[in-house]
């Protein structure tokens, strides 16, 4: 069971205790700090929709430290990032791999960041499957459609050609923060909150 820190705020007459994620939400900060699955996806989607309703003109700040995970859960987060009218600024701390990298690069243009020692990894979608030959064929066709859509997203957010994206995602491709910036996955490497 993960340990969740709490913070206490007082305004003179009363004290309030928040779990750290609820407190960060007050400052429009959301956090993807685990593998992408339906549970974290639903939580992030709900937080973005709440922040959109609260103030549709203020940025949302999404911090990412994720090894990737479920494509469908990740696409729910991606679609919501594109759906809300607020800009979603993305920050890679630690790692953004696979679906985590897709979400990192899906941030608002000019507002995609990584800390200096962050690692970013892109690759083609992965899947394991079993069943009859026909069932496997159906899954392979779906995996090809997913790969095509992932490539379209990377093209849209990086400006690279389909050929380059296909070549670069054929196998795991790891990048430093500086390399990810040169590649177009992020806009800037930041060393402090003042950058």
Swiss-Prot record:
SUPFAM superfamilies, A to Z: ClpP/crotonase (SSF52096)
Domain of life: Bacteria
Coiled coil: none
Active site: 98 (nucleophile), 123
Intracellular or extracellular location(s): Cytoplasm
Alphabetically ordered keywords of this record: Cytoplasm, Hydrolase, Protease, Serine protease
Pfam families: CLP_protease (PF00574)
EC code(s) of this entry: 3.4.21.92
Subunit structure: Fourteen ClpP subunits assemble into 2 heptameric rings which stack back to back to give a disk-like structure with a central cavity, resembling the structure of eukaryotic proteasomes.
The protein's role, per its UniProt record: Cleaves peptides in various proteins in a process that requires ATP hydrolysis. Has a chymotrypsin-like activity. Plays a major role in the degradation of misfolded proteins.
Recorded family membership: Belongs to the peptidase S14 family.
PANTHER family: ATP-DEPENDENT CLP PROTEASE PROTEOLYTIC SUBUNIT
Name of the featured protein: ATP-dependent Clp protease proteolytic subunit 2
Gene that this polypeptide is encoded by: clpP2
